[in-house]
A protein has these predicted regions:
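Short structural boundary motif marking the start of a folded domain
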Residues: 1-7
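NAD(P)H dinucleotide-binding glycine-rich loop of Rossmann-like/cofactor-binding domains
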Residues: 96-179
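Hydrophobic/small residue at the entry helix of a nucleotide-binding pocket
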Residues: 152, 188-189, 216
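Adenosine-nucleotide cofactor-binding segment
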Residues: 177-178, 183, 196-245
Length: 245
């Protein structure tokens, strides 16, 4: 039996760091360690809403869940059902948004034995059935933890669209060598968005990034300068009027 130390949610603003034994792994489950888990404001929202959050079970006060959904680690043991696909010693990441057809359950929100804020977890069958346990071959664990937030950035870029003149067709994604504006873009997710705009498959000719914090703007300006294909302008929101933009 594997012992774990985890941060568990019992209700609104009721988080407890506890050490306890995980149950025996079933044949359709996977036992894994967690090495890194990055912080997400979605977890802050979850902790504040507790049982009122749509992904948190109503009985969380008596059946707590482990929070954290941006995690990366090592597979320790694999149940018989999944031994054809996963092996002990593999690194993994989880796509936490399972998109189950009948309920909103997700790791880090809904399950008692899996979440990023833990030393060891049991990954339930639903994660593998939804093809949301991914073998990870990156160089560092922390980069694995960034897979989930980066997927959100990519989704946002892909959700942009432009109308084609003279038709009702929607062209999805940002416009190649067009103009892109990122508002409030020097926080963690904003920096990921800047990085993706510069180094992703489609690059704008001009990228404008605004924020209200001069220190953050200076940090972004230093670490993400213009590239040959993309000119970047960093602007304080007070200076980013209609005429300027």
């Amino acid at each position: 039996m594997q012992t774990t130390t985890a941060l568990r949610l019992y209700g609104k603003r009721d988080l407890r760091l506890e050490t306890f034994d995980l149950p025996e792994m079933r044949d359709d489950e996977i036992l894994a360690s967690v090495v890194t888990d990055s912080l997400c404001l979605s977890s802050w929202k979850e902790a504040n809403q507790g049982e009122n959050h749509k992904k948190v079970p109503d009985d969380v006060a008596t059946n707590p869940i482990i929070i954290g959904h941006e995690f990366c680690g090592d597979i320790i043991a694999v149940g018989k059902k999944w031994q054809h696909k996963f092996q002990p010693g593999q690194r993994y990441v989880i796509q936490a948004n399972l998109q189950l057809p009948d309920r909103p359950d997700c790791p880090g929100y809904s399950f008692p034995w899996v979440g990023g804020e833990a030393t060891h977890v049991i990954i339930p069958d639903e994660v593998m059935e939804q093809d949301c346990l991914l073998a990870y071959e990156g160089e560092t664990y922390f980069e694995g933890s960034l897979v989930e937030p980066l997927s959100c950035v990519i989704g946002a870029f892909n959700a942009n669209y432009h109308l084609q003149e003279g038709s009702y067709n929607h062209k999805m994604g940002i416009r190649p060598q067009g103009h892109t504006l990122i508002l409030g873009g020097t926080g963690p997710m904003g920096l990921l968005a800047i990085d993706y705009a510069l180094h992703g498959p489609v690059n704008p000719a001009m990228l404008v990034v605004t924020d209200t914090n001069n220190d953050k703007l200076s940090y972004a300006r230093k670490h993400y300068p213009s590239e040959p294909q993309t000119l970047i302008h960093y602007l304080h929101a007070q200076d980013a009027g209609y005429d300027t933009l």
